[in-house]
UniProtKB/Swiss-Prot annotation:
This is Degenerin mec-4. GO terms for cellular component: axon; neuron projection membrane; plasma membrane. Probable sodium channel subunit. May be needed for mechanosensory transduction (touch sensitivity). Negatively regulates the turning step of male mating behavior. Keywords: Glycoprotein, Ion channel, Ion transport, Membrane, Neurodegeneration, Sodium, Sodium channel, Sodium transport, Transmembrane, Transmembrane helix, Transport. Residues 189-200 have a biased composition (Basic and acidic residues). One of its GO terms (molecular function) is ligand-gated sodium channel activity. The channel is probably composed of at least the mec-2, mec-4, mec-6 and mec-10 subunits. It is found in: Membrane. InterPro entries: Deg-1, ENaC, ENaC_CS, Mec-4/10_cyt. Residues 187-221, 237-260 are annotated as: Disordered.
Amino acid sequence: MSWMQNLKNYQHLRDPSEYMSQVYGDPLAYLQENTKFVTEREYYEDFGYGECFNSSESEVQCELITGEFDPKLLPYDKRLAWHFKEFCYKTSAHGIPMIGEAPNVYYRAVWVMLFLGCMIMLYLNAQSVLDKYNRNEKIVDIQLKFDTAPFPAITLCNLNPYKASLATSVDLVKRTLSAFDGAMGKAGGNKEHDGEKEVITEAPTTPAPTTKPSRRRGKRDLSGAFFEPGFARCLCGSQGSSEQEDKDDEKEEEMHETTTRKPFNINDADEEWDGMEEYDNNEHYENYDVEATTGMNMMEECQSERTKFDEPTGFDDRCICAFDRSTHDAWPCFLNGTWETTECDTCNEHAFCTKDNKTAKGHRSPCICAPSKFCVAYNGKTPPIEIWTYLQGGTPTEDPNFLEAMGFQGMTDEVAIVTKAKENMFAMATLSMQDRERLSTTKRELVHKCSFNGKACDIEADFLTHIDPVFGSCFTFNHNRTVNLTSIRAGPMYGLRMLVYVNASDYMPTTEATGVRLTIHDKEDFPFPDTFGYSAPTGYVSSFGLRLRKMSRLPAPYGDCVPDGKTSDYIYSNYEYSVEGCYRSCFQQLVLKECRCGDPRFPVPEGARHCDAADPVARRCLDARMNDLGGLHGSFRCRCQQPCRQSIYSVTYSPAKWPSLSLQIQLGSCNGTAVECNKHYKENGAMVEVFYEQLNFEMLTESEAYGFVNLLADFGGQLGLWCGISFLTCCEFVFLFLETAYMSAEHNYSLYKKKKAEKAKKVASGSF
């Protein structure tokens, strides 16, 4: 039919009251009895319900959509059906109105299939979009910033952690070094003695004319030697004349072998023993007012090579000798009362000390000196060793538990023994920070000269002391976090330049190289010189060129970095989080949990204690935990992520010999001639330069590759492509849900009121 017939039927809607009464009767009748209602579809007979909306007349549209037809008067189920039909005709989503307005079943079926197909495609593409979003992909943006980069903090350490002259006064260190000497002696076997035999075999067979047999004692080798004062039985005066004659013959033979004789000088390390053996007792004796109660000269050197295994019988044969545990040498020896306890200018790694040294600087070391001015480091706190007791029992006189704790048993490789000895030096953790700082190098002793940006540094103010468990006292330049230092230009002249002095003559026997250790880090980060440091040798100018890269990482869910700050178990308080610090914290927590004490190399939380380095049980537990973690970085027990913000310094190292022969100037506090100071600093000093190679730095910034905005754009595109749905269309569905929920609640509330009224009515009728 034409739309005019529809308008004719529409006239029935002009009077709503009459229409509702005519079609539905009483609106509330459905609550009282089952009444068959005439639906809109039946009313319009053969006309499609949607055809009424095809009229282009604005008045008709107004009446149909907004006007006088009230769906609230319909029964609940009919009202819902009417509401859904209204939504189908009015929604802006594609396909749904075509299904609702379909003139027949076939037409509707085609549109249903098309709609379902589009929904399937929408699902597949939407799933792909969501998967891409859930992958949390990120991109790295690299920018080159042409700006002055902040200068890093520089931590400087001496490769020798503690002064041998002072550290050997600590009983535990002394015992550790003694065990180390014993292990080195066993590992080396009789190599030195075999070498002497080879020399004798290759020597000319024609003996020199002599009136008595020659008993040549080989020259003592300083490598590995370590002197300490010890009591021994000796032969003095006429008792030791035969040995003295042998010694004179030995010195006479050496005179034929050596044309030039030099006194001992710490500036000439290769000849230091020559000077020690060439002293002349008569030239160095001083007039001590000592009464010779036994008829002998108490200032005279005594002999103990034949008697050192025997216990002294009295005052006349009780001497103090310079004893070396590794070679069992006891020489020189003088009567007990002739040694003088005093202070020496320098003491080297062999505990041999000298007085009145022109190149010496800093504090003096306690020592004990013989009348010949042969001096040995000695603090006087522990009595000298009894040599006869030591030699009769050998190294086993040491506590077996202590030897086991040191871990030298069964070791035959000298390099491994030295490494183990370095590890054992964490025994110093039993001392307070103040004591460890006192035993180590001071900043004034290590840093002689310093400049930054071409201007002199204030060594006391610009360097902060930091006690490291491996390197002792270290000193950090640019430690003030409130001051931002920058280089005004690139190149070594505008960076940090330091003249350092290591005093190699006072090195520990466990220190293998002379020089300094340099660590470059952010001032907020804890320095780890044993892991990230660079070594700079003496006798060279070491140039470290820097390039800075700043990393900015995304936290979860895009990345796996740790936000600014530190984790709860981080043991390096007042410092920012780092991966190395995390691993060490994890290891320390594991040790504290299973060993009931902490590794002495790392800090412990408040209330915890460090393990005793001499306790074999604690050492076994520490070694077991180390093996469990595969070193310090066992990933299966410790999970440490990168920090979200990090500064990475790339270092380029280049050395050159230093000082040059033309550098004829007084360096540091050297009081000798320019040539002597030049040679002295070549063995004990170094020049260190740290600078930026370019005044720019890289910024590496992570950002999300596919964010929420991208998700909305792609998802909205898929909705529009396959279903023609926009954000407003989604709002239509939301309102549809809210309206149907409201109608359901309203209907249930009406039923509730009806039941309540019926119940009240029954109660009222029952009371009459």
